[in-house]
UniProtKB/Swiss-Prot annotation:
Job of this protein: Caeridins show neither neuropeptide activity nor antibiotic activity.
Entry keyword annotation includes Secreted: yes
Entry comment describing in which tissues the protein is expressed: Expressed by the skin parotoid and/or rostral glands.
Record keywords: Amidation, Amphibian defense peptide, Secreted
UniProt modified residues of type Leucine amide: L15
GO cellular component: extracellular region
UniProt organism field: Ranoidea caerulea (Green tree frog)
High-level lineage: Eukaryota, Metazoa, Chordata, Craniata, Vertebrata
Entry's localization field: Secreted
One GO term of the biological process aspect: defense response
Name of the protein in its database record: Caeridin-5
Length: 15
């Protein structure tokens, strides 16, 4: 994601 730490895989915010 944009600020993704984990959700980057889903292209989310990674919260």
């Amino acid at each position: 994601g944009l600020l993704g730490m984990v959700g980057s895989l889903l292209g989310g915010l990674g919260l």
